[in-house]
Amino acid sequence: GEKIVEYVETGQIEALEAEREALPVDMAALTRVEGIGPKTAKKLYDALGIEDLDDLEAAAEAEEIQSVSGFGEKTEQNILDNLPFAREAGQRSLLGAARPIGEEIRGFLGAVDHVEEAALAGSLRRWRPTIGDVDVLVATERPRSVTETLTDWDRVESVVESGPTKSTLRVAGMQVDVRQVDPAEFGSALVYFTGSKAHNIVLRNRAIDRSRKVNEYGVFEVTDAERADPDTRAGDRVAGETEEGVYEALDLPYIPPELREDRGEVAAADAGTLPDLLEEGDMRGDLHTHTTWSDGEATIEEMIEGAAAFGHDYLVISDHAAGPGVVADTGLTDDQLRDQLGAIEDAAADAEIEVLTSVEANVAPDGSIGDTDRDLLAELDLVVASPHADLRDGSDRTDRLVAAVEDPLVDVLGHPSGRLLNERPAMEFDPGALGAAAAKHGVALEVNANPHRLDLWGAAVAAAIDEGATIAIDTDAHDPSKFSYLRYGVHTARRGWATKADVLNARDVDGLWAFLE
């Protein structure tokens, strides 16, 4: 109690500040390196004075870490291998943190006088799992007026730079770049600043083949002399106001932002074979959720009510089975799971949506499914199996995941790679081989929509779907507010070219039961 009072009154806790001075290390950065926890970080500081990632890298390269007791050559190499991940993770924000900020800024700018249109751009618009900074594009003929209004906004923490065409700001701790363009050039600027760079290069080459050029200012008919002209607007502008117009001027249909990664989308657009992508409104239920019976924060009844309010037709309750990697004392024993089935049945009797029984079983290192009684698993409507332990050994674990989907009791493979964005890299596996096994055995592969996971990710979804696999998009919700994570999963699946037909829980209740049977 005293420390809370001290914090409220002074904004700090003296004992904690003293600890920090005694151990002046960048704990957040060091513990992002696989194999380093707070205790290890302290040990390295005491032995070698390592305070940050630069110190760590220098010590590892000088082969000093292997001299510290408890560390060997292999650990030292592991640290070097994992440093790039730790560095990048420190510079990138999660999609789930950045997207709401971007949408708030877009909404604010969209309502400003003289703004004709405002849109998100960059990796945020492509729904990448992590984001460098937030890019927003504004169409206006009065850029100075818009800049003044923007820099006066009370959500702006600081103005890094501001000019008539570009402002860089800090909002909610994130860097935001706002670019202002002439409405006649808004579409071409949006294509350009949405990216990816690789996608834009393919478009540029396509323009050259048509005696045209494309850049952020438009699509232009050009002579050879005009193409070489340093004036970027040289030539006869044939498109630029809308993205659709830009693609049309290159003889292409519109390509959704999630696909713009140079993974064959321009060739598919040219051939007329772009997929009819899944939409948020196609989703009908959630197959992976938790309650207070395990580590969730809402009761069975609250989760059912929340799912109904969200618009779902069905909900699967899949609390954790006890096992390695599951928070101590939160996983269900067989007896507790049997008791829960009765509680779910009672709650389902009064529910306006269909409620299915399940458990989130644990995928052991050999791919077998935890310790839950198999007769009990067979009684459930559906079994989700997920890896929770032994996620960091760095070797290829395709065999582990394939063994799990080969188990006849498994219906959904949850967060297959076990990754935690910016915290823990994905387990190594071959998504195509896993997709083929899942298709053969009638198991759905999960896109876990929690912004800390987004697992599977776009390229893995595409590889699995190419092998005939079915995808399940689940929120792993631990309370009803997390049902809104679903959109992150939907757009992640869209990055993998997923259609409604590819997604298990875009089917109605009858379609779900048909798959499970």
Where are these regions (language model features)?
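Gly-rich Lys/Arg/Thr-decorated short loops/hinges at beta-loop-alpha junctions or inter-strand turns
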Residues: A86-E88, G281-L287
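Generic amphipathic alpha-helical segments used as scaffolds and interaction surfaces in large
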Residues: G35, L44-A47, R92-G96, L190-A198, ...
